[in-house]
């Protein structure tokens, strides 16, 4: 049986100057601009027919603070599709509290790289289906990696970064996703710092490299500018494609995106299904 390909909107949430949660968009994990209210945007995407919804607290890890659980709870009250929440999750207590706030899945990046056993413990305590490992990867054109791919005629590898892309780790992203799979991750959420916010398309070489390395479902993220970019991600092996700007700024609707993909032959759930 052919598995349905998923279309997933995402909101990046930070605290505004008054300390209130707000949605922001940026380019290459920088140049953040106010976009809207997280609860209102969640409600909008739920009603629009999204397959899932992702809420990322984009500064919790870097600032060493807890995830905005009150806001997560308010968002969970408005969405009746699977909700993934990431940002600031460092241990199993954080996972538990995030799930209690209404998340169906948690996305972990920095916390899992700092302590890889968190993947094992999270999967054992809550089930692999709850544990999404997020990878914020960037291209490196040097000889310090382990797995190389060709990009525009040059050989590069993909480095894992932490704390919202602010710090490199020296860790090869392909090595890490394979380890995360072995430890029990139920899904992999692959972000490209190079493509983020550009709307020039996903980093297809990155997506393909991850999909070729693992059997765990992969969500492609960063760089979507049109439904055709999602098709490219699916062709590279992704099970789901995540987008932000094209939906936030009404460049494409969820319904229009799904119709375009379905017409192109991809197995897509209808918005009103």
UniProtKB/Swiss-Prot annotation:
Gene assigned in the entry: hisF
Subcellular localization, as worded in the UniProt entry: Cytoplasm
Function: IGPS catalyzes the conversion of PRFAR and glutamine to IGP, AICAR and glutamate. The HisF subunit catalyzes the cyclization activity that produces IGP and AICAR from PRFAR using the ammonia provided by the HisH subunit.
Coiled coil feature spans: none
UniProt pathway: Amino-acid biosynthesis; L-histidine biosynthesis; L-histidine from 5-phospho-alpha-D-ribose 1-diphosphate: step 5/9
GO molecular function: imidazoleglycerol-phosphate synthase activity; lyase activity
Species assigned in the record: Halobacterium salinarum (strain ATCC 700922 / JCM 11081 / NRC-1) (Halobacterium halobium)
Catalysed reaction equations from the record: 5-[(5-phospho-1-deoxy-D-ribulos-1-ylimino)methylamino]-1-(5-phospho-beta-D-ribosyl)imidazole-4-carboxamide + L-glutamine = D-erythro-1-(imidazol-4-yl)glycerol 3-phosphate + 5-amino-1-(5-phospho-beta-D-ribosyl)imidazole-4-carboxamide + L-glutamate + H(+)
Protein name, UniProt field: Imidazole glycerol phosphate synthase subunit HisF
GO biological process terms on file: L-histidine biosynthetic process
């Amino acid at each position: 049986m052919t598995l349905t390909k998923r279309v997933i909107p995402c909101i990046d949430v930070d605290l505004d100057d008054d300390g209130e949660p707000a949605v922001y968009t940026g380019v290459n994990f920088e140049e953040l601009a106010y976009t809207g209210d997280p609860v209102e945007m969640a409600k909008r995407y739920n009603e629009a027919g999204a397959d899932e919804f992702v809420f990322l607290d984009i500064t919790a890890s870097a600032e060493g603070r807890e995830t905005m659980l009150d806001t997560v709870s308010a968002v969970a009250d408005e969405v009746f599709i699977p909700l993934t929440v990431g940002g600031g999750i460092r241990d199993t207590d954080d996972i538990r509290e995030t799930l209690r706030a209404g998340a169906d899945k948690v996305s972990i990046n920095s916390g899992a790289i700092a302590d890889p056993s968190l993947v094992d413990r999270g999967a054992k305590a809550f089930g692999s289906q709850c544990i999404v490992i997020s990878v914020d990867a960037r291209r490196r054109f040097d000889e310090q990696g382990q797995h190389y791919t060709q990009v525009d005629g040059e050989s590069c590898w993909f480095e894992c970064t932490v704390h919202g892309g602010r710090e490199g780790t020296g860790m090869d992203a392909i090595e890490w996703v394979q380890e995360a799979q072995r430890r029990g991750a139920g899904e992999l959420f692959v972000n490209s710092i190079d493509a983020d916010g550009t709307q020039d398309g996903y980093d297809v070489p990155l997506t393909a490299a991850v999909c070729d390395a693992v059997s765990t479902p992969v969500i492609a993220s960063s760089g979507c500018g049109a439904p055709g970019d999602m098709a490219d991600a699916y062709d590279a092996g992704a099970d789901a494609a995540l987008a932000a700007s094209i939906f936030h700024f009404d460049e494409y609707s969820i319904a229009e995106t799904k119709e375009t993909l379905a017409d192109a032959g991809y197995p897509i759930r209808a918005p009103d299904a």
